[in-house]
């Protein structure tokens, strides 16, 4: 009986150790709670990579002109993501001074990095817009 308990405890300890050995850090909207950074900015992506994050999550909206832009909120600095053209959205300055990025610009900045990207498509207002966004991605 003691041997069974010892084997069970050993297996439990091994599985707990094994699980913790695979835990990875994902930066939510990049590493943005640091100087010179902002949520979903290219700087936040670069900083997530620089500290060795396994991945960096970011949010994508389909703008009114069917271009994809990177931002978390449905409305940002007075502009609704779905109702505004991408040119108006990319003219918005983030809190760190960067322009709100397009998905293409964001992906280009990510190409040389080791951090994996986790794209969250923000819920479009209609199934048709959702399909368009998915096809563009």
Stretches found by the model and what they are:
Residues 1-2:
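N-terminal secretory signal peptides that target proteins for export/translocation
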Residues 17-137:
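Phosphate-group recognition and catalysis centered on beta-loop-alpha active-site segments
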């Amino acid at each position: 009986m003691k041997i069974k308990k010892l084997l069970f405890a050993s297996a439990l300890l091994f599985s707990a150790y094994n699980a913790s050995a695979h835990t990875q850090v994902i930066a939510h909207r990049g590493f943005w709670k640091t100087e010179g950074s902002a949520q979903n900015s290219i700087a936040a992506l670069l900083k997530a990579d620089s500290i060795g994050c396994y991945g960096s999550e970011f949010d994508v909206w389909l703008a009114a002109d069917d271009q994809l832009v990177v931002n978390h909120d449905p409305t940002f600095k007075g502009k609704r993501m779905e109702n505004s053209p991408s040119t108006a959205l990319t003219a918005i300055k983030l809190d760190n001074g960067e322009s709100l990025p397009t998905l293409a610009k964001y992906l280009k900045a990510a190409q040389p990095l080791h951090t994996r990207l986790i794209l969250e498509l923000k819920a479009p207002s209609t199934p048709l817009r959702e399909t368009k966004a998915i096809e563009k991605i």
